[in-house]
Amino acid sequence: SLERAKAFYDLGLIAEGNREWQWGIRTLNTAELLAAAQWAQKHDLLHRSINTAIKVAEHYPLEHDLLYPRPFEDEIEDYAEMAKIDINWVYGLMRQESRFIAAARSSVGANGLMQIMPATAKWIAKELEIDNFKPETIYEIETNIYFGTAYLRSLLDRLGNNIILATAGYNA
């Protein structure tokens, strides 16, 4: 069942993969859930790894990296440094916004790892003086992280470097 879920994810069928995953883990005990979370992490299914690890964490402490993985380290470090923002803030937002699914699309139309709205992406491209911006590139990992960190920087600048207001403003 977990293998079928992975096959759905590999085909880009996120909803089907999620249903298959939930069906596959429904009867697992805590030790089996932990193994499933580790398996998901090994196969880069971080959204499933995190959500399954949360179920395990209700019963006993877990390794930090199962609950809080750090994928895309090079890109996040580079763009967070460029924007002069805390890398942990970027990871926290990305974890919450997309669970690290690069192809994520919200019901309101936010896209990619950092869940950037199309109009916001166009505005960011203009601010960054990117003349040939194509909306579909927002799903590219590097572009999404670049735009997301630039947007966070602009929010901090407008909100007096208040990270709480900037975090709230990110989803406003």
Enumerate the predicted regions with their spans.
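Catalytic glycan-binding domains that act on GlcNAc-containing polysaccharides
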Residues: 1-4, 11-172
